[in-house]
């Protein structure tokens, strides 16, 4: 659609419908917006927009509401994403900078997104398919127990408490762990998790006979940590926000909540959005563009985050009704993703 005036009319309809929850008529458009034309001209423009599938008339109402196609054109033609205020940016930064580790960052992020957008928020844990081992720590913690800590270059931490039954006594366990720690780090630091896991067999075979049993137990636990690190995970918050706006969903609320409970569905959706995006930028899917059962009446706004512009580790975003304040929501998702990326890069 090349007519700038009709695009302005569509933009006004979207903005008014999102703010008022009511179908929008030509008279209201003339009163609220400086469109510079008569109500009759507005009615003609609305007729064309309806004929082309950008707006529709719900039931017997005299007003019109946007269709998925109308929302899509509105989003695609946004001149710029509405910036957040300095106060909002400071609040986001302060809240996220208090995080202790990746788990805390993800937890704070998903709660923050749900709060500021009033939608359901989804955060994918940093993908470790390309992550490397930063450090492995082995610490005796009393008796024949030991703490194994795996730290990746993305900040992810996996840990296990081991009951090392093969150790003769606490002193010999401490000595074996110290020697193992040096050999393990020399072997796996800097390697991808999958590659590091494959090296564990050689590591055990090259261990001196006196420490062989301890090394075997440590290798099993470290292998579990490396495997756990490769699992894809998502967290969700703010489903209560969907309950509050259930009347705005064109599909049943139950279907949406059911889909959100299936993390496999969410992971598949996130993967598709990653493929759609350009280097982790903002991606918006509207209504029927979401092909997954139960989500075709919602809109999803996501952005990638990572440790740098070329290192996108995962995605975060929100899901809500198609009647969404897209400029504000897109600004919030973009701002949060940037702050999370800065924290991970530190």
UniProtKB/Swiss-Prot annotation:
Recorded GO MF terms: DNA binding; DNA-binding transcription factor activity
Key words, A-Z: Repressor, Stress response, Transcription, Transcription regulation
Pfam families xref list: HrcA (PF01628), HTH_DeoR (PF08220)
InterPro entries: DeoR_HTH, GAF-like_dom_sf, HrcA, HrcA_C, WH-like_DNA-bd_sf, WH_DNA-bd_sf, WHTH_transcript_rep_HrcA_IDD
Record-annotated membrane-spanning stretches: none
GO BP term, pick one: negative regulation of DNA-templated transcription
Keyword Iron-sulfur: no
Name of the protein in its database record: Heat-inducible transcription repressor HrcA
Native source species: Kineococcus radiotolerans (strain ATCC BAA-149 / DSM 14245 / SRS30216)
Gene name as annotated: hrcA
């Amino acid at each position: 659609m090349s007519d700038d005036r009709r695009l302005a009319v569509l933009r006004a309809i979207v903005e008014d419908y999102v703010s008022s929850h009511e179908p929008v008529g030509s008279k209201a458009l003339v009163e609220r917006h400086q469109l510079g034309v008569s109500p009759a001209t507005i009615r003609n423009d609305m007729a064309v927009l309806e004929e082309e599938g950008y707006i529709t008339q719900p039931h017997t109402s005299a007003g019109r509401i946007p269709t998925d196609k109308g929302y899509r054109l509105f989003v695609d033609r946004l001149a710029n994403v509405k910036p957040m205020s300095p106060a909002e940016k400071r609040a986001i930064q302060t809240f996220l900078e208090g995080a202790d580790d990746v788990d805390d960052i993800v937890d704070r992020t998903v709660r923050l997104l749900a709060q500021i957008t009033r939608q359901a928020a989804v955060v994918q844990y940093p993908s470790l398919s390309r992550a490397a081992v930063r450090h492995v720590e082995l610490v005796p913690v009393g008796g024949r127990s030991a703490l194994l800590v795996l730290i990746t270059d993305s900040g992810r931490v996996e840990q296990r408490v081991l009951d090392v039954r093969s150790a003769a006594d606490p002193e010999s366990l401490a000595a074996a762990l110290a020697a193992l720690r040096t050999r393990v780090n020399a072997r796996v630091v800097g390697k991808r998790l999958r590659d590091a896991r494959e090296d564990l067999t050689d590591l055990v075979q090259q261990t001196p006979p006196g420490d062989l049993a301890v090394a075997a137990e440590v290798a099993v636990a470290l292998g579990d940590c490396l495997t756990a690190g490769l699992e894809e995970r998502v967290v969700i918050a703010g489903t209560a926000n969907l309950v509050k706006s259930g009347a705005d969903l064109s599909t049943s609320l139950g279907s949406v909540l059911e889909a959100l409970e299936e993390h496999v569905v969410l992971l598949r959706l996130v993967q598709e959005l990653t493929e759609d995006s350009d280097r982790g930028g903002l991606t918006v899917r509207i209504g029927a563009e979401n092909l997954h059962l139960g989500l075709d009446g919602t809109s999803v706004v996501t952005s990638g985050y990572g440790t740098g512009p070329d290192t996108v580790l995962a995605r975060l975003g929100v899901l809500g009704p198609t009647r969404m304040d897209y400029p504000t929501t897109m600004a919030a998702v973009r701002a949060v993703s940037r702050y999370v990326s800065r924290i991970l890069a530190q």
